[in-house]
Amino acid sequence: MGTLLAFVVGAALVSSAWGGCVEVDSETEAVYGMTFKILCISCKRRSETNAETFTEWTFRQKGTEEFVKILRYENEVLQLEEDERFEGRVVWNGSRGTKDLQDLSIFITNVTYNHSGDYECHVYRLLFFDNYEHNTSVVKKIHLEVVDKANRDMASIVSEIMMYVLIVVLTIWLVAEMVYCYKKIAAATEAAAQENASEYLAITSESKENCTGVQVAE
């Protein structure tokens, strides 16, 4: 159920899709002490175009004013900045085995309240064309709140309510079908019994007439 909900909510957040790549907004609520994935997906407009991409992530802690760089990922190498808030907690979860990065997501393990704030995923892409090269840059912004326990979103609540309504409706329909079938079978059985009784009376009457005819003949 959770997997299905997670899929429905993700599909609803789709912003664009080019050449099989789908851009999905990141979740924005992390639970204290748990692992949280911050999504950063940047699709190319043309999948057939060769490209090289690298990313830099910056962070502004809640209550502060300046962004600080926390990591850089380029040529399959993750370079982490010295920041005790993220030391031993950041794991690369984006594209692997390619320089053409489109998924630039990260994991933060053992989330703390110090991780609440604004994240920026800076995407730098070099596109290779036949006669020239072209640089592009995109910034994905994510605001993250850290809470004590997970809050159920409205989609989850509505989905669960609809599930229970569907169960009730199906149960009522099933009971109605069973009652209908029972009445139909009972009516057919009663009709067959009446028909058999009529045939029995007809046979009995005919037998009596035959017996009377035999007696008269004697």
Swiss-Prot record:
Pfam families: V-set (PF07686). GO terms for molecular function: sodium channel inhibitor activity; sodium channel regulator activity; transmembrane transporter binding. The keyword Membrane applies. It is found in: Cell membrane; Perikaryon; Cell projection; Cell projection, Axon. Residues 180-218 are cytoplasmic. One of its GO terms (biological process) is sodium ion transmembrane transport. Residues 22-150 form the Ig-like C2-type domain. Glycans are attached at residues 93, 110, 114, 135. The keyword Ribonucleoprotein does not apply. GO terms for cellular component: axon; perikaryon; plasma membrane; voltage-gated sodium channel complex. Keywords: Cell membrane, Cell projection, Disulfide bond, Glycoprotein, Immunoglobulin domain, Ion transport, Membrane, Signal, Sodium, Sodium transport, Transmembrane, Transmembrane helix, Transport. Regulatory subunit of multiple voltage-gated sodium (Nav) channels directly mediating the depolarization of excitable membranes. Navs, also called VGSCs (voltage-gated sodium channels) or VDSCs (voltage-dependent sodium channels), operate by switching between closed and open conformations depending on the voltage difference across the membrane. In the open conformation they allow Na(+) ions to selectively pass through the pore, along their electrochemical gradient. A voltage-gated sodium (Nav) channel consists of an ion-conducting pore-forming alpha subunit functional on its own that is regulated by one or more beta subunits. Interacts with SCN1A; regulatory subunit of SCN1A/Nav1.1. Interacts with SCN3A; regulatory subunit of SCN3A/Nav1.3. Interacts with SCN4A; regulatory subunit of SCN4A/Nav1.4. Interacts with SCN5A; regulatory subunit of SCN5A/Nav1.5. Interacts with SCN8A; regulatory subunit of SCN8A/Nav1.6. Interacts with SCN9A; regulatory subunit of SCN9A/Nav1.7. Interacts with SCN10A; regulatory subunit of SCN10A/Nav1.8. Interacts with NFASC. Belongs to the sodium channel auxiliary subunit SCN1B (TC 8.A.17) family. This is Sodium channel regulatory subunit beta-1. It comes from Bos taurus. The lineage of its organism: Eukaryota, Metazoa, Chordata, Craniata, Vertebrata. The gene is SCN1B.
